[in-house]
UniProtKB/Swiss-Prot annotation:
Keywords on record: Antiviral defense, ATP-binding, GTP-binding, Immunity, Innate immunity, Magnesium, Manganese, Metal-binding, Nucleotide-binding, Nucleotidyltransferase, RNA-binding, Transferase
Control of this protein's activity: The enzyme activity is specifically activated by double-stranded RNA (dsRNA).
BP GO terms, sorted: defense response to virus; immune response involved in response to exogenous dsRNA; innate immune response
Protein name as it appears in the record: Cyclic GMP-AMP synthase-like receptor
Database matches in InterPro entries: Mab-21-like_nuc_Trfase, Mab-21_HhH/H2TH-like, MAB21L/cGLR
Catalysis performed (reactions): GTP + ATP = 2',3'-cGAMP + 2 diphosphate; GTP + ATP = pppGp(2'-5')A + diphosphate; pppGp(2'-5')A = 2',3'-cGAMP + diphosphate
Pfam families for the chain: Mab-21 (PF03281), Mab-21_C (PF20266)
EC class (word): transferase
Recorded GO MF terms: 3',2'-cyclic GMP-AMP synthase activity; ATP binding; double-stranded RNA binding; GTP binding; metal ion binding
Residues that bind Mn(2+): I288, E289, D292
C-alpha cells in the first residue's frame, strides 16, 4: 500500500516542480503589474495597501492537481491614529471593527488622502462594512482593467516581462476573480482577489480564542469580508478572522503531513465534495496538537490511515471546531443525515482498504484516472502545457 500511495501522489496529485514554478512566476508577475496599476487608479488604495498575501492550498503545499486556482489576499492597513477597535461578535470566529477616532485621523495632514474612507468603507457609527468593502474592491478592479487594452468586450490584455496575457473577470462570494490566459487563448489560471485588513498582535482576539503561537515571527492576522452561515444583523458588520500565516507554520516541516492531507482531499473530491478543503486542514491542525514530531516521520501508509480514521471521528461527531475558536463548528451548517452518510462512506472505505490494501487506488481515483493508473500513464507530468519560448527565458522575478 505504501508504494501505491506514493505512486498515486506522484502521478495524480503532485505536479512536476518545473510546472509549478512556471505558473507561480506567471501569477506573481501578473499580480505585481496589476497591483501597481491599481495604485494609479485610487490614491486611497495606494495609501491603505500593505502587501499581497499568497494564500490558499497552493502556497500551503496542499494543492491537489493542477495549479489553476489561487487565493490571494490584498492586505490593507488602517493607521493606528484612527483607533481601530476589534470586538468579538456574537458569532464565534467573527469580529466587528469600529474606528473610534476617524475624524481626528482625517484632520491630520497625512489624513487628506483618506477623506473618502467613511463613504467607501464604513456604515453607521463608523463600523467597517463588508458590503461597502466588496463594492469598492469590485469598482477598483473594473477601473484598473479599463486602463488596459481590450481585446474584445470581455477580455483585456496585460504585458510584462513574461509575455502578453489575456484577462477577464467575474465576481463570486467575497472574491473578485481574474481569469488569466495566454494570448493564444489557452487558459492558465483563475485568481481570487479578496480585500482584507491586516492587524498586528496587539489586536489579537482574546475571549475564547487561542493565543498566537508565533508572536515574534508571525504577529499579524487578517479580517476577511466573509459572512457567517445563517441570518445575522446587521450583515455588513461581520468579518471573518484569518490566521493563515500561523497555520502555514504549524503544518510546515512535518514530513508526511502534507502528502496525507492531499490524499484525504483527493478522497473527499471523489466521495464527499461538500466538505470544504479548509475543514480537512483544520482537522490536521487539531491532530498536530495530539502527535509529536516523530509521528509525521512514519510511513505514509500509517500516517494516512491514522489521520483518515481521526478525520472520520470528527465527521461522525458532526463537529469540526474551528482551530482558533472552538465554539465555531465549521460543519454545523450541514444536515446531520449528510454527515452520517459521509461518515458511513468513509468507514466503509477504511474497512475495505484494511482488508484489501490494494483497493486504495479504486477509492482515491475516478474511473478515468483508475484506467490511466492501470495503464501506467503519468497524468500529472502532462498536466500543463509548456510555456511559449518567449516565456521560458531566464527571467528572474525581483
Amino acid at each position: 500500500m505504501e508504494n501505491i500511495l506514493n505512486d498515486i501522489n506522484k502521478r495524480f496529485i503532485s505536479l512536476p516542480e518545473e510546472d509549478v514554478r512556471g505558473n507561480k512566476q506567471i501569477l506573481e508577475s501578473v499580480l505585481r503589474t496589476f497591483v501597481e496599476q491599481m495604485k494609479t487608479q485610487d490614491p486611497l488604495f495606494k495609501a491603505l495597501f500593505r502587501r499581497v498575501f499568497y494564500g490558499g492550498s497552493f502556497y500551503d503545499g496542499l494543492k491537489v492537481g493542477k495549479p489553476e486556482e489561487f487565493d490571494l489576499d490584498i492586505l490593507l492597513h488602517i493607521p493606528i491614529y484612527a483607533q481601530p477597535v476589534l470586538n468579538e461578535s456574537n458569532v464565534p470566529g467573527f469580529v466587528w471593527l469600529k474606528l473610534n477616532n476617524l475624524d481626528g485621523w482625517l484632520r491630520q495632514p497625512e489624513g487628506r488622502v483618506y477623506k473618502d474612507f467613511r463613504k467607501k468603507f464604513l456604515a453607521d457609527n463608523d463600523f467597517l462594512d463588508t458590503g461597502k468593502t466588496l463594492r469598492w474592491m469590485e469598482s477598483l478592479v473594473q477601473k484598473t482593467l479599463n486602463t488596459l487594452p481590450w481585446v474584445n468586450n470581455a477580455t483585456c490584455e496585460l504585458t510584462n516581462e513574461f509575455g502578453t496575457f489575456h484577462i477577464n473577470w467575474w465576481k463570486g462570494g467575497p472574491a473578485m476573480t481574474l481569469g488569466i490566459s495566454h494570448s493564444s487563448g489557452e487558459k492558465i489560471m483563475d485568481v481570487d482577489l479578496v480585500a482584507c485588513f491586516v492587524f498586528s498582535g496587539d489586536k489579537w482576539p482574546i475571549n475564547g480564542y487561542r493565543s498566537n503561537p508565533f508572536p515574534s515571527t508571525k504577529p499579524e492576522f487578517f479580517i476577511v469580508p466573509k459572512k457567517p452561515q445563517g441570518p445575522v444583523n446587521p450583515q455588513g458588520r461581520y468579518w471573518s478572522l484569518s490566521f493563515q500565516e500561523q497555520e502555514r507554520v504549524l503544518i510546515d516541516n512535518k514530513n508526511r503531513l502534507k502528502p496525507a492531507v492531499k490524499l484525504i482531499k483527493k478522497l473527499k473530491e471523489k466521495t464527499h465534495p461538500n466538505i470544504a478543503s479548509y475543514y480537512i486542514k483544520t482537522v490536521f491542525l487539531h491532530i498536530i496538537e495530539q502527535k509529536d514530531q516523530s509521528f509525521w516521520n512514519k510511513s505514509l501508509r500509517e500516517v494516512f490511515m491514522t489521520t483518515l480514521r481521526e478525520y472520520n471521528e470528527f465527521i461522525a461527531d458532526q463537529s469540526i471546531p474551528y482551530y482558533w475558536c472552538r465554539k465555531n463548528n465549521l460543519i454545523g451548517h450541514l444536515a446531520p443525515i449528510t454527515l452520517n452518510n459521509i461518515s458511513n462512506r468513509i468507514g466503509y472505505i477504511i474497512k475495505d482498504i484494511e482488508n484489501n490494501p490494494e483497493n486504495i487506488a479504486k477509492h482515491l481515483l475516478t474511473k478515468e484516472e483508475y484506467t490511466k493508473y492501470i495503464q501506467g500513464e503519468d497524468v500529472m507530468a502532462e498536466a500543463l502545457p509548456a510555456l511559449p519560448a518567449s516565456q521560458t527565458s531566464s527571467c528572474v522575478i525581483i
